[in-house]
């Protein structure tokens, strides 16, 4: 019999209940007990949703981040919070979000100032984790209370629970040594704590533990490979079954290593690594379980169940009870329930599967394998009809778009002149001071903005009323920026619910869910648009708002666009053509918008590529192909403008050392980047590579409520000036200010502008 299980379930709730609960707590509008009760209710509901599985995950739920939770389980708290002895949940929030010494937040609880932990992308997804911090003298100690509480809840509910933990080697790999010590030197101290955790779970009657080691799909040197052998030899003696889980890619040169580790089962992502399954069947010892991730855990298209069964049936005969079925990875990366999407186009809806529907697909596959296809004939027939409907739909294929793609040539992506000539013309046109100040684009999305948007979508506010409300918010943003004496202004993006969804709503080839939310980090959720067909732009998308904002000021107003690579990487993308083709389609559509903005007199246009690095394949050998079409797409978008139009781009959570040449090849006049959480470490890339254009290193962390001091910003910019000539430096936050409050934004920007003025005086 085939065993079904799940690697993880979305934690936010079908209607973002966790997000709203967290924000109420952080604002002091609810108690800690109420927040914990909400978490317990969500877990109860989610285990009920997974009741048909043979094994359901526990430990996948986290109030903020599962990697942060693992740090607390292992007793690895950053030194700056080790002296706080309050509730563990509040301590976790301190690490994740930071606390300013003057924090107005309830529950800041006399903490004094605490810097937020560094946050970065979870592999090549749009989820973010809090980076574990290590020092040479780091010690570990077990705190299993979180897992044991969830296990007790699951047992009381009758759940056949499978705890999910992050493996020791991946945990070290994901972290950062704050003193430049060797992370792997900590492995001997870490392994006994893992062993004690497994012993604790064994004592509670747990039979299987899922231990996630996704770095096995990356390129590992000999030292890291040996760490796997060392770690699992040490854990082999525990009297508990270990399912080693890999996902997000192929094992490739790590396949033999993974198959040889002394564990009881191995999970493989068969969406990305189907070609490796036969080799694993040959190499795995005959008693070992092979878990096949046959359902795509990262995208929302229905699985072709009949084709999947054609592939699985011979494996089931060969493996028998050793065959397990699961999604390819945790379902954290997809929305919860398609059944809530009453407003979604019926035809497109028939092509989709969210988390609950993916579990239904899993059940159909397992039933067909265990009892025969006849027992699920109706479900298989309905699935086949949906697959064929999508394949044949004229809404998916647009001949005019395909013809435009065929006409793309290299000249389309070239500026008329090199940067040095452009910079001279832009300087004359813009007349900016040294260390010019700007923001990344968005300002706080206030309750009034959200209410107006909600009323407009509900039909209780007409278009004229909505436009008036948004213009009032834009004017407020402009006046605040003028008062702060910023140099290049933005309109604040009041009219935008999301930097990707806003554009997708206005492009043909996109569809939109109502409740298709996924977690990005903490309480931050995004609702990726659904790229289902060929992309085109029917009309201008931003010109009206930007030209209105420019009419309110004599200072330069940035046109704000999201770039094609980021729109692609932050969408649920069609899987019936190469991603590069979809990206080129987006590039042509956004290029039309760039040219319309320039025609309307906009002098500075920012094309955000926040997710450029996120799309990199996990293996470097595949980077060049991705970077080629990603950079080409940006250049197609940006490079049709005149020399005196200044093109900006923004990237966040990115490390640049290994792709700096490609970033330079994008040829943006100004790039703004996230650097504050890493204390300008990201600028190390510029020690050896002389970046030719202008750059704005982010000088304060917008993800934290902390208010940066003027001296702190000056210090960061001095570090930046050691690597980048002062005349090519900008001063800006590290990301948009949408999620902050005006009461935080104004003092932070006041200090930022004051710092820029100090710097100008120092370089005179």
From Swiss-Prot:
Binding site residues for Zn(2+): 650, 652, 674, 735
UniProt keyword Protease present: no
Cofactor note: Binds 1 zinc ion per subunit.
Annotated binding of 5-methyltetrahydropteroyltri-L-glutamate, by residue: 16-19, 121, 524-525, 570, 614
Catalytic activity of the protein: 5-methyltetrahydropteroyltri-L-glutamate + L-homocysteine = tetrahydropteroyltri-L-glutamate + L-methionine
Catalytic residues, chain numbering: 703 (proton donor)
Highest taxon in the source lineage: Bacteria
Record-level Gene Ontology MF annotations: 5-methyltetrahydropteroyltriglutamate-homocysteine S-methyltransferase activity; zinc ion binding
Biological processes annotated in GO: methionine biosynthetic process; methylation
Alphabetical list of SUPFAM superfamilies matching this protein: UROD/MetE-like
A Pfam family it matches: Meth_synt_2
Pathway where this protein functions: Amino-acid biosynthesis; L-methionine biosynthesis via de novo pathway; L-methionine from L-homocysteine (MetE route): step 1/1
Residues engaged in binding L-methionine: 440-442, 493, 608
Binding site for L-homocysteine: 440-442, 493, 608
Cofactor(s), names only, from the UniProt record: Zn(2+)
The enzyme's E.C. designation: 2.1.1.14
Top enzyme class: transferase
Signal peptide feature range: none
UniProtKB keywords: Amino-acid biosynthesis, Metal-binding, Methionine biosynthesis, Methyltransferase, Repeat, Transferase, Zinc
NCBIfam families: met_syn_B12ind (TIGR01371), PRK05222.1 (NF003556)
Similarity comment: Belongs to the vitamin-B12 independent methionine synthase family.
HAMAP family from the UniProt entry: Meth_synth
Described purpose of this protein according to its UniProt entry: Catalyzes the transfer of a methyl group from 5-methyltetrahydrofolate to homocysteine resulting in methionine formation.
PANTHER family: 5-METHYLTETRAHYDROPTEROYLTRIGLUTAMATE--HOMOCYSTEINE METHYLTRANSFERASE
The protein's name in its UniProt record: 5-methyltetrahydropteroyltriglutamate--homocysteine methyltransferase
């Amino acid at each position: 019999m085939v065993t079904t299980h799940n690697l993880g379930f979305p934690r936010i709730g079908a209607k973002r209940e966790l997000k709203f609960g967290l924000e109420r707590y952080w604002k002091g509008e609810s108690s800690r007990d109420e927040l914990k009760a909400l978490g317990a209710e969500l877990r109860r509901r989610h285990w009920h949703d997974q009741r048909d599985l043979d094994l359901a995950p526990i430990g996948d739920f986290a109030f903020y981040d599962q990697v942060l939770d693992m740090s607390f389980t292992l007793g690895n708290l950053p030194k700056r919070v080790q002296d706080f002895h309050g509730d563990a949940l509040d301590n976790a929030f301190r690490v994740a979000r930071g606390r300013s010494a003057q924090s107005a937040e309830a529950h800041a609880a006399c903490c004094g100032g605490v810097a937020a932990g560094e946050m970065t992308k979870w592999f090549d997804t749009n989820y973010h984790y809090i980076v574990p911090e290590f020092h040479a003298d780091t010690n570990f100690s077990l705190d299993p209370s979180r897992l044991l509480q969830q296990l007790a809840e699951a047992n009381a509910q009758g759940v056949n629970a499978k705890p999910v933990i992050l493996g020791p080697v991946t945990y070290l790999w994901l972290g950062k040594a704050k003193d430049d010590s060797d992370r792997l030197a900590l492995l001997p101290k870490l392994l006994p704590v893992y062993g004690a955790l497994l012993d604790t779970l064994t004592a509670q009657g747990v039979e299987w533990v899922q231990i996630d080691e996704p770095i096995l799909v990356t390129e590992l040197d000999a030292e890291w490979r040996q760490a796997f052998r060392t770690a699992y030899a040490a854990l082999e003696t525990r009297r508990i079954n270990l399912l080693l889980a890999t996902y997000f890619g192929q094992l490739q040169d790590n396949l033999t290593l993974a198959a040889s580790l002394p564990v009881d089962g191995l999970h493989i992502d068969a969406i990305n690594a189907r070609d490796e399954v036969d080799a694993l069947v040959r190499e795995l010892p005959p008693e070992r379980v092979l878990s096949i991730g046959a359902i795509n855990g990262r995208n929302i298209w229905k699985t072709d169940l009949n084709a999947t069964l054609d592939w699985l049936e011979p494996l089931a005969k060969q493996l028998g009870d050793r065959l397990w079925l699961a999604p390819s990875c945790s379902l954290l990366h997809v929305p919860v329930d398609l059944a809530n999407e009453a407003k979604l186009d019926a035809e497109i809806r028939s092509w989709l599967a969210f988390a609950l529907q993916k579990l239904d697909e899993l059940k159909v596959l397992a039933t067909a394998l265990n009892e025969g296809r006849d027992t699920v004939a109706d479900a298989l027939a309905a699935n086949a009809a949906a697959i064929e409907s999508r394949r044949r739909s004229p809404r998916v294929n647009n001949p005019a778009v395909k013809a435009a793609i065929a006409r793309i040539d290299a000249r389309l992506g070239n500026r008329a002149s090199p940067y040095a000539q452009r910079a001279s013309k832009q300087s004359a046109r813009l007349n900016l001071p040294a260390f010019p100040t700007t923001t990344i684009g968005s300002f706080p999305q206030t309750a009034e903005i959200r209410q107006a948007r909600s009323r407009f979508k509900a039909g209780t506010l007409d278009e004229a009323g909505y436009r008036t409300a948004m213009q009032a918010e834009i004017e407020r943003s402009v006046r605040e920026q003028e008062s702060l004496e910023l140099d290049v202004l933005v309109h604040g993006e009041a009219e935008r619910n999301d930097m990707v969804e806003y554009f997708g709503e206005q492009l043909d080839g996109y569809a939109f869910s109502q409740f298709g939310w996924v977690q990005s980090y903490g309480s931050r959720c995004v609702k990726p648009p659904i790229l289902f067909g060929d992309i085109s732009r029917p009309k201008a998308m931003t010109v009206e708002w930007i030209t209105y904002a420019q009419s309110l000021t004599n200072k330069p107003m940035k046109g704000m666009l999201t770039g094609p690579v980021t729109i692609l990487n932050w969408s649920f993308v069609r899987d019936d053509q190469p991603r590069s083709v979809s990206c080129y389609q987006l590039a042509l559509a956004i290029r039309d918008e760039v040219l319309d903005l320039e025609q309307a007199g906009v002098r500075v246009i920012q094309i955000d590529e926040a997710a450029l690095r996120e799309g990199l394949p996990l293996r470097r050998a595949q980077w060049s192909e991705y970077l080629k079409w990603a950079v080409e797409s940006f250049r197609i978008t940006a490079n049709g403008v005149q020399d005196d139009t200044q093109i900006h781009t923004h990237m966040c959570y990115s490390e640049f050392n290994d792709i700096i040449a490609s970033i330079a090849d994008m040829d943006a006049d100004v790039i703004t980047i996230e650097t504050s959480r890493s204390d300008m470490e990201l600028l190390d890339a510029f020690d050896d590579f002389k970046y030719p254009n202008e750059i704005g290193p982010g000088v304060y962390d917008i993800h934290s409520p902390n208010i940066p001091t003027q001296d702190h910003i000056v210090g960061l910019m001095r570090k930046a000036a050691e690597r980048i000539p002062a005349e090519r430096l900008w001063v800006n936050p590290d990301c948009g200010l949408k999620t902050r409050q005006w009461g935080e934004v104004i003092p932070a920007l006041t200090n930022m502008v004051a710092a820029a003025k100090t710097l100008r005086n120092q370089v005179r």
